[in-house]
């Protein structure tokens, strides 16, 4: 379970991801949203869920960027409508529409670049990132 953000830009992050991870992001965003609607079980206490808690609208924006890039690469997407509906619901609920405070934190994004390099070194080497491939994830949770 992970939402990869090698960049503070959702669209740029989507463009950077390999197909395997890009496709999974859409599904994992849905799983995180569903987990946030529960009080126990599943992924409720996973750090990826906790870091987006209170920022559901931004998670949907991130997911939309993943869906757009997925379609741009020629794949079919069946999740964009789910995220659009969720945004409407969250706006109606008065949820926080602002980006999370960790977006733009260089140590956070560097940890994601590092882990992407570890997972698929041949693919991610093209970006010339300076991070070593062994940094731990930075989980911005309390």
Language-model features, listed with the residues they occupy:
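Expand to "…catalyze enediolate/carbanion chemistry for C-C bond making/breaking, isomerization
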Residues: 1-142
């Amino acid at each position: 379970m992970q939402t990869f953000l090698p960049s503070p830009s959702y669209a740029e992050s989507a463009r950077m991801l390999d197909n395997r991870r890009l496709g999974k992001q859409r599904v994992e965003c849905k799983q995180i949203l569903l987990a946030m609607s529960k009080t126990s079980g599943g992924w409720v206490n996973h750090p990826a869920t906790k870091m987006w808690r209170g920022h559901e609208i931004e998670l949907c924006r991130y997911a939309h960027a993943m869906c757009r890039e997925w379609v741009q690469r020629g794949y079919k997407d069946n999740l964009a409508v789910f995220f659009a509906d969720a945004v409407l619901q969250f706006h109606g609920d008065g949820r926080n529409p602002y980006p999370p405070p960790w977006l733009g934190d260089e140590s956070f994004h560097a940890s994601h670049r590092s882990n992407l390099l570890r997972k698929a070194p041949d693919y991610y080497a093209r970006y010339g990132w300076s991070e070593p491939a062994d940094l731990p994830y930075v989980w911005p949770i309390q």
